[in-house]
Amino acid sequence: MGSPFAKKEDRPDINDEQKGMKKKVAIQGIAGSYHDVAAQRYFEGEAVEPVPCDTFREVIEHVSAGTVGMMAIENTIAGSLLQNHELIREGNCRIVGEYKLRIMHSFAALPGTRAEDITEVNSHPIALMQCRDFLDTLPGAKLVECDDTAGSARWVAEKQMHGHGVICARRAAEMYGLEVLAEGVETNKRNYTRFLVIARPDLAEHMQQEAVRNKASLVFALPHTSGSLSKVLTILSFYDMNLSKIQSLPIIGREWEYMFYVNLTFEDYTRYRQALEAIIPLTNDLKTLGEYEQGKQSI
């Protein structure tokens, strides 16, 4: 069964990106968001035009129609975005790359605003949570949750909200004309988000013709037999696969059954393919979500 997200007639030509246009990248949020920052870093040297989306499902819809997507998959503090694993699988998307972005939050407001003038701070709830120690130094400020860090910055700027501060990326503050009052206000300085670059299968093949492949993302179910997961892991170990992540999600409508999302890193692609063949008889619904180069981590 094909992807439920796209109609064939809506799909652009595979060579559209080669005609001198900006590279369009679908992101959750707007320009200046951390998804936008990750896209700009990953495609450094290319002209990137973010395609704003309200939801991650909307990102998948754009990817199914032929646009490259950038999607957060896990954060070192907040953990995994579980629904995004399922969206990638259900949308029949392919992972073609990843980028690990250090999340450095800035505190910004309208130009000329002083920190003591702030009566309300607006941002995404996770950003507010990650800056709690800094926000405690503003005891008179009310914290108000919003859908997007960059959206908060744009709203304060466009509505000229005096007395409002925002937690956002420096890129968002500069883009919308706010003044950065403090930088690096996150409590934990080892705050990273891993973003996946995703594409429609035919575009993924085109993008990866000469790509280095030393990481793979797989998903599979297992039979209800004793030691079924242990057997799979033993085989992966035998073929020198490094299991960098394993995540289980319940299968809706099938009580106590799970899909396992696995990330593997490896040095020998041939050994990886042999490992994949070896676990096929032990798994159900095995699917490769992507084979790609292990991502760099920003400083």
Task: Enumerate the language-model features and the residues they cover.
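Domain-level signature for soluble enzymes in the chorismate/prephenate branch of the shikimate pathway
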Residues: 1-299
